[in-house]
A protein has these predicted regions:
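Membrane-proximal interfacial segments on either side of biological membranes
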Residues: 1-113, 122-324
Length: 324
């Protein structure tokens, strides 16, 4: 590829196929100064990445430079289409459009629109993002497959299956928040399975905690709602309420789990160690001060015999989720 020498080796990108076309014109005059314009076109591009592969890249950009300002997509938006991107996650049908002025201003904004992709057997999209930003751009999750997600992340201590939906309002210039009052909820039945070695380890270290954790070894979740907040330092806060049953123990006894988790998302993304954090939370939360409230082997646990954050109650009816 003739353009390969123009790409830094540090990027780990190796061009594979595709066609590239560009046209440019410029002028310099005493009164008008320097102006330029043109367009770039990439058809069916493909490349090897440092940790993956990209194929089916189509890119069209028209531009104009005048008075130190770039006009992007003067007649039609800058268009990006990618058929497939295989990296940490497999993504298909990626779309994005960009139009406006850079540097942007209130009178000459820059707008990112039509952003979407198919990912994890579901779809992810972003509402129009206008810069300068006044309103949140909403990242919408539709039927994201947890089984596909956990297959990629491979946490050791637990696994989940089923699909979820969600909406995450994104802020780029908020003094505190990147995501505020987002939510993720189940789309149909979910299942949760805790690792046997994890639950056995907790049971051996604390018999009371073991009685409670036994109800979480396997859960069929009928209702799950998680509030999501993320500050601009990367501090992620998840506040969840889960209703389900352990059909392997008693399908008529509901288990309600209230769970709050805090994590630095930037560090978490680097480590992807979800399971270790869950184990730490379980060990800290499912601990009672004494064994006096441990139920007998022949009896079902009551709400008072479970630790704070977990309760057991008749399944019918399960209360409607309260608005956050």
């Amino acid at each position: 590829m003739v353009f390969q020498p123009l790409i830094s080796k540090d990027l780990g990108i190796k061009l594979r196929d595709g066609t590239f076309y560009a046209q440019a014109a410029f002028s310099a005059a005493r009164e008008q100064g320097f102006t330029a314009g043109g367009h770039w076109v990439v058809n069916n591009g493909g490349m090897w990445l440092q940790d993956g592969e990209l194929s089916g890249l189509d890119f069209v950009m028209s531009y104009r430079l005048q008075n130190h300002h770039w006009q992007l997509g003067a007649k039609e938006p800058v268009m990006l289409r990618i058929a497939s991107l295989n990296n940490l996650f497999d993504m298909q049908n990626i779309t994005a459009d960009l139009q406006g002025t850079y540097p942007y201003s209130e009178t000459a904004p820059l707008t990112l629109s039509n952003v979407g992709m198919d990912i994890l057997n579901g779809h992810l999209s972003l509402s129009a993002l206008r810069l300068p930003q006044h309103d949140a751009a909403v990242l919408k999750l539709s039927q994201i497959d947890l089984s596909a997600l956990f297959t990629v992340l491979q946490p050791k201590q637990f696994a989940m299956s089923g699909k979820v939906n969600g909406e995450l309002p994104l802020y780029l210039n908020n003094p505190q928040w990147l995501v505020r009052n987002g939510w993720i909820a189940n789309d149909g039945m979910l299942t949760l399975r805790l690792d046997k070695d994890l639950t056995d380890s907790i049971s051996e270290s604390n018999t009371v905690a073991g009685a409670a954790i036994d109800w979480l070894r396997y859960m069929e979740i009928s209702q799950s709602y998680t509030k999501v907040d993320l500050d601009n330092l990367g501090q992620l806060t998840l506040t969840s309420k889960v209703h389900g049953v352990n059909s392997q123990k008693n399908s008529t006894r509901a288990v309600v789990l209230n769970y709050q988790h805090k994590e630095n998302l930037f560090q978490l993304w680097r480590s992807l160690r979800f399971g270790d954090n869950l184990q730490e939370w379980l060990q800290q939360t499912i601990s009672l001060p004494s064994a006096s409230s441990l139920p007998s082997a022949s009896s079902l646990p009551s709400a008072s015999s479970l630790p704070q954050g977990i309760s057991s109650q008749p399944t019918a009816p399960i209360p409607t989720r309260a608005k956050e």
